[in-house]
Amino acid sequence: MSYGPLDMYRNPGPSGPQLRDFSSIIQTCSGNIQRISQATAQIKNSMSQLGTKQDSSKLQENLQQLQHSTNQLAKETNELLKELGSLPLPLSTSEQRQQRLQKERLMNDFSAALNNFQAVQRRVSEKEKESIARARAGSRLSAEERQREEQLVSFDSHEEWNQMQSQDDEVAITEQDLELIKERETAIRQLEADILDVNQIFKDLAMMIHDQGDLIDSIEANVESSEVHVERATEQLQRAAYYQKKSRKKMCILVLVLSVIIVILGLIIWLVYKTK
């Protein structure tokens, strides 16, 4: 398995600014979250080799690059989520609800992926510190330097000179070990800085979730307001229909009464003319 940097997780694209819509940002964020999860599993697998026979400078270098690349991917996703929150809302209430559900699901997935990634980051940091502690405990530099100072006081024979040369070689090896320790300490400082970056992302995510809650309240208020208007309109239509029906009924009664009156008047007139 390769433990190289996260090049395959990078999203190629033009260097110039791009106008992105809601769907494209959602798709990019979803892909990034999946890649963060995949990289976390890869880091965890590499971490299991630290402190074993498979441990090497190359492994540690690749692990550091992979971890840092994943951290950058998380920061990129965080910025995309901020951009997502700045997009104008659609006019349709149903579309607003759909977008809100998509954003909720996306932020939940991102939070879960970040939790797993940060847990692995901290475990890698612990293992690196344990490895440095073991290396320092096994270092012979202090004792050998003390022996070297004693030998520098006097060496009267060729045997003492050869012994001194041998000790110089051992000291040189130990200094190389210490150089590796310094490199690991630098890597740990970078790792801890990346962990702090993830902490900041969590804070930003919490703020976005809070804003999302305010947005949900606003949408629900708009929905309730729309429902009230619909109910009022329905009630008014029902009243209008009732009054219209009542008016028609009165009109029918009036027409019927007028018809009866006309008939009666007609009969009276007919009877009058008939008697004459």
UniProtKB/Swiss-Prot annotation:
Modification sites for N-acetylserine: 2
Chain positions found as Phosphoserine: 139, 142, 218, 225
Start and end residues of each t-SNARE coiled-coil homology domain: 178-240
Any one GO molecular-function label of the UniProt entry: SNARE binding
Membrane association type: Single-pass type IV membrane protein
Pfam family, one: Syntaxin_2
Coarse class of the protein's main subcellular location: membrane
Cell compartments where the protein resides: Endosome membrane; Golgi apparatus membrane; Endomembrane system; Early endosome membrane
Membrane topology (Vesicular): 270-276
Annotated GO biological process: autophagosome assembly; endocytic recycling; intracellular protein transport; vesicle docking; vesicle fusion
Gene3D superfamilies: 1.20.5.110, 1.20.58.70
Domain of life, per lineage: Eukaryota
Key words of the record: Acetylation, Coiled coil, Endosome, Golgi apparatus, Membrane, Phosphoprotein, Protein transport, Transmembrane, Transmembrane helix, Transport
CDD domains according to UniProt: SNARE_syntaxin12, SynN
Transmembrane segments: 249-269
UniProt entry tagged with the keyword Ribosomal protein: no
Coiled-coil region: 33-131
PROSITE patterns in UniProt: SYNTAXIN, T_SNARE
Cytoplasmic topological intervals: 2-248
Function noted in UniProt: SNARE promoting fusion of transport vesicles with target membranes. Together with SNARE STX6, promotes movement of vesicles from endosomes to the cell membrane, and may therefore function in the endocytic recycling pathway. Through complex formation with GRIP1, GRIA2 and NSG1 controls the intracellular fate of AMPAR and the endosomal sorting of the GRIA2 subunit toward recycling and membrane targeting.
Family in the record: Belongs to the syntaxin family.
The protein's assembly and partners: Associates with the BLOC-1 complex. Interacts with BLOC1S6. Interacts with NAPA and SNAP23. Identified in a complex containing STX6, STX12, VAMP4 and VTI1A. Interacts with GRIPAP1. Forms a complex with GRIP1, GRIA2 and NSG1; controls the intracellular fate of AMPAR and the endosomal sorting of the GRIA2 subunit toward recycling and membrane targeting. Interacts with NSG1. Interacts with TPC1. Interacts (via N-terminus) with VPS13B.
This protein's name: Syntaxin-12
Lineage: Eukaryota, Metazoa, Chordata, Craniata, Vertebrata
The gene coding this protein: STX12
